[in-house]
Amino acid sequence: MSDTQNLKRRLAIVYLKEYFEANKHLPVTTNNLLDYLSFKGVFIERKTLIESIKALKVYGMDIQVEKGRKASYFYQGMKQEG
């Protein structure tokens, strides 16, 4: 993997944060997220995507998951402290 590709992969979490913030309260599928990252030049596997979403949740983003045949993610905002 080239240095540029490696850097872009590391940026995936930043791009995901931007995407969730721009689509607040809207259902977002795994394919939506992978397509957006692809548009940004970032190519990751689904497993890596799931781990990135978990990291964003730890960061404090309230991302709800609706499981089913096609999982949907809903960003509700930042979690409140307290």
Give, region by region, the residue ranges found by the protein language model.
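Short, basic/aromatic recognition patches that contact phosphate-bearing ligands
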Residues: M1-G82
